Amino acid sequence: MRSVIKVLELKNASDVVTIKKAISNKTGVLAIQINIEKREINVVYDDYLLTVNDMVDCIEDLGYSIL
């Protein structure tokens, strides 16, 4: 499954590293690509192991707001 998550506070390389590290550690994540300009996270994942809500919760736990 592929999902696009929009993050309000995604502004710099440090944000990319923080979010990428947290999401990549989730079981079921196959690929992740982050676009700072669009404030988007594109995630390919196994929807039997993980839901988009699991990833949203993870990002929000880091202090970011989801659009």
Question: Where are the language model's segments positioned?
Answer:
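Short glycine-/aliphatic-rich beta-strand segments at the starts of folded cytosolic domains
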Residues: 1-9
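Short amphipathic alpha-helix segments
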Residues: 11-25
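Short amphipathic alpha-helices in soluble, non-transmembrane regions
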Residues: 18-22, 54-61
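Short acidic amphipathic segments
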Residues: 23-35
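Conserved short beta-strand edge segments in small beta-sheet-based binding/regulatory domains
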Residues: 34, 62-67
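A generic structural motif
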Residues: 39-44
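Helix N-cap motif at beta-to-alpha junctions
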Residues: 46-50
